[in-house]
Amino acid sequence: MRIQLLLVATLVASIVATRVEDMATFRTEKQWQQDLQYRREFVKRQLAPKPKSNIVVSHTVSCVIDGGNMTSVWRFEGQFNPHIASEVILHDTSGLYNVPHEIQNDGQVLTVTVKRSAPADIAKVLISLKPVQLSSGQYECRPQLQLPWVPRPSSFMYDSYRLWYEKRWLTIILYVFMWTYLVTLLQYCIVRFIGTRLFYFLQRNITIRFTGKPTYNLLTYPVKG
């Protein structure tokens, strides 16, 4: 029993020591957001200009609808190879695969201009440009841009950050071991003391019921009468 108590005390001391060490390095959510922004800028810096690679850093969209005509302009900033004109494909949901468009490219700025009528059956216009996919709703030229290499903050990412970068997983492992040990110890106590007494109590009552004589043992006393 002394060894078991010593083990419990050791586990509790380890958990307390781990928590104290983590307090100095724990970062708030605001600090984590700043670190995430720094990592975004670091990724952008790592995307150095390379030949034959198209990289999108930022973009702007403008749209003008005059009567039944729609003029939309997508302006991308980054790095684009001279053959980007053959890699940009526009299509919509009405079945028209290659939407007529104009492309201007100076290597750092790519401008895609679409001039066409906007009938009711036009649901959206997609621009296939790696690694970007743009979409616009009906009579709307404000596509949503999603860059796959820019992470979006979420509670799951923040919890994972705390677990792995701040060594919180050690605390969780210690908690699991501690609670497993406590449950096992509680089960042992129940079986060793309460279960044994209950067994002898039932055995004594059965013996008295069928023989009329009480059974003497170290845990119970004979019934008088």
From Swiss-Prot:
GO terms classed as biological process: symbiont-mediated perturbation of host defense response
Membrane topology classification: Single-pass type I membrane protein
Leader sequence residues: 1-17
Protein family: Belongs to the cytomegalovirus US6 family.
Disulphide bridges, residue numbers: C63-C141
Keywords: Disulfide bond, Glycoprotein, Host endoplasmic reticulum, Host membrane, Immunoglobulin domain, Membrane, Signal, Transmembrane, Transmembrane helix
Source superkingdom: Viruses
Listed transmembrane segments: 171-191
Name of the featured protein: Unique short US7 glycoprotein
Intervals, Cytoplasmic compartment: 192-225
InterPro entries per UniProt: CMV_US
Entries under Pfam families matching the protein: CMV_US (PF08001)
Sites carrying sugar chains: N69
Residue ranges annotated for the Ig-like H-type domain, each copy included: 54-145
Source species taxonomy: Viruses, Duplodnaviria, Heunggongvirae, Peploviricota, Herviviricetes
Originating organism: Human cytomegalovirus (strain AD169)
Gene Ontology cellular-component terms listed: host cell endoplasmic reticulum membrane; membrane
Compartments it resides in: Host endoplasmic reticulum membrane
UniProt keyword Transmembrane, yes or no: yes
Lumenal compartment segments: 18-170
